[in-house]
């Protein structure tokens, strides 16, 4: 099962990712990542929106699976398989960017762990599921505030001193698991986002209004429900292929496109200054949109 508004939201998220990952020189600071712990800039929305879309898709995926007459336990196995493949794909992409084999946690690996939490705990009754998601989210926040960090103390949350950083440096980084602690709130957020997926699936506007409090992403998803289908069409090619929309540009930019893209950017900036940089960014985004438009037209969707 697929939801048009959810596909459109995923497409918007992929477009946003292409934008913030390819900003030209001199781009406004608010389009990048914000100062640590102070404010949210444009780039800071990308990862949470991926998590939101992932969680909202779980109810659709599970219902479509069970409609085929397959046993529920097989869905859990399938979720484990998808998480494992996504994790391995992330390792491959991280290694490709590093130019050598690397075992480390990056974006796709964290998405895989968060998806596994959301998919496996989705079977819980609604109140227990809500309670578990809040335990993960609030428990993470409480740990940051209350657990003392050696040499720093409790309640300190600076970029150079906080509990997550201490755990990463002291215990997780030597094992290649730097960032594993972040799987706690990301898993909780994906689980919480399953309620949004259920509201979309059942058309419950009251729930959608309540869930809009989750953030701007939820509000956009709700707004997309009221948008005429034709207006959402430009976002669907990327939204139907979000995993490929993330991995393919990153992989090619790190390998065969790296040199040509840098040369083209330098030439455009030298000729037209800041305008040339934006021409490069816009052309890069438009080029990928056309790639995924034709994949969409051909019905080619990459799934794990």
Question: Where are each of the predicted segments found?
Answer:
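Alpha-helical transmembrane segments and their immediate juxtamembrane cytosolic regions
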Residues: 1-304
């Amino acid at each position: 099962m697929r939801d048009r508004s959810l596909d459109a939201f995923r497409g918007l998220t992929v477009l946003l990712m292409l934008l913030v990952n390819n900003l030209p020189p001199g781009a406004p600071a608010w389009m990048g990542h914000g100062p640590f712990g102070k404010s949210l800039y444009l780039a800071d929305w990308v990862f949470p929106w991926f998590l939101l879309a992932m969680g909202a898709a779980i109810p659709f995926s599970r219902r479509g699976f069970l409609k085929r007459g397959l046993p529920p336990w097989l869905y859990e196995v399938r979720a484990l398989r998808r998480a494992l493949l996504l994790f391995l794909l992330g390792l491959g992409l991280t290694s490709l960017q590093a130019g050598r084999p690397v075992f480390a946690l990056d974006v796709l690996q964290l998405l895989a762990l968060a998806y596994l939490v959301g998919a496996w705990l989705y079977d819980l009754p609604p109140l227990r599921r809500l309670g578990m998601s809040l335990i993960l989210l609030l428990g993470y926040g409480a740990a940051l505030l209350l657990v003392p960090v050696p040499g720093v103390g409790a309640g300190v949350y600076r970029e150079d001193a906080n509990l997550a950083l201490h755990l990463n440096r002291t215990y997780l980084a030597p094992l290649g698991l730097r960032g594993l602690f972040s799987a706690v709130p990301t898993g909780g957020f994906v689980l919480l986002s399953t309620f949004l997926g259920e509201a979309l699936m059942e058309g419950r506007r009251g729930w959608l209004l309540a869930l809009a409090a989750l953030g701007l992403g939820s509000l956009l998803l709700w707004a997309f429900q009221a948008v005429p289908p034709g207006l959402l069409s430009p976002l669907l090619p990327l939204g139907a292929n979000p995993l490929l929309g993330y991995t393919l540009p990153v992989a090619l930019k790190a390998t065969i496109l790296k040199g040509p893209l840098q040369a083209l950017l330098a030439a455009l900036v030298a000729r037209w200054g800041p305008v040339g940089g934006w021409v490069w960014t816009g052309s890069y985004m438009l080029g990928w949109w056309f790639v995924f438009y034709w994949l969409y037209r051909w019905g080619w969707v990459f799934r794990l």
